[in-house]
Amino acid sequence: MGVAGGQYLDLSYEKQQVSKIKIIEMAIKKTGKLFSFCCAAPAIIKKMSSQQVKFFENIGSNIGLLFQIADDLIDFKGDSKIAGKKTRKDQKKGKATLISLLGYENAVKYCDKIIFDINKSLKKYGSNSKNIRETLVYILNRNK
């Protein structure tokens, strides 16, 4: 199940008690699959091993998860004028998010953990991973 399946889960989980694992799985399907492909495609084109392709797929899934949580954080606390879209929709609709389950601060801490884990995985690439590391910080700190 990919992006469409993740969106289906998002809609079906509204106003439901959903576990952390299910929320994470939904976010990975909803957003992580897109980032997963974007990260794996260069490895596929370069004809890297299946193990290396899987490594980059996992990095992409985690970046997508981070992006989805960051988007939920913007919805929760963001300014509609700055974000360029209506905010505070998730809570009104009863969306299953890590914020609704863990609270805002714990969702931010979870994002910090995702960033730490991705950076740890990319450590072997040294300065070649600088742009990705900077992008991770941008994703979390963006306001639109």
Regions found by a protein language model. Give the residues of each.
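All-alpha prenyltransferase/terpene-synthase fold signal
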Residues: 1-144
